[in-house]
Swiss-Prot record:
This is Topoisomerase I damage affected protein 2. Gene3D superfamilies: Tctex-1. GO terms for biological process: negative regulation of actin filament polymerization; negative regulation of barbed-end actin filament capping. It comes from the Eukaryota.
């Protein structure tokens, strides 16, 4: 049995940044930082937040990364811990999720989540 983690997001019509730009931003920041010896998910999140703030200052952003680990090679036994909750206006606020490209090591998959919250009341 194969397990796939897809890129699913809520309706992105109200996103302050188009889906394609979000995907490009995540890929570029990840590409720049993944090869560095001091790579951490906190560094990745910081780079994504910096890019988001350059695109639009009318929103506050929340970025999370979920790393899915295969507990035993060759099995479909995965470990995932990620919780998210929000109270927002569906007309102004939303989220986008994106799976980072898998490397040769298929025992791990990382998911980036970006949340935007309108600063206006």
């Amino acid at each position: 049995m194969n397990v796939e983690i897809g890129n699913r997001s809520l309706d992105n019509e109200n996103s302050p940044i188009p889906k394609e730009k979000l995907t490009t931003l995540i890929d570029e920041v990840y590409g720049e930082r993944k090869e560095k010896s001091d790579f951490t998910y906190n560094n990745l999140i910081q780079g994504i937040l910096e890019g988001l703030n350059k695109h639009s200052s009318f929103y506050k952003y929340i970025v999370t990364v979920t790393d899915v680990q295969n507990k035993q090679s060759g099995s479909n036994d995965f470990e995932l811990e990620h919780y998210f909750g929000a109270s927002w206006s569906s007309k102004k606020d939303g989220l986008f999720q994106y799976c980072l490209p898998s490397e040769e090591d298929t025992s791990s998959q990382s998911v980036v989540t970006i949340v935007w919250i309108s600063k206006s009341i």
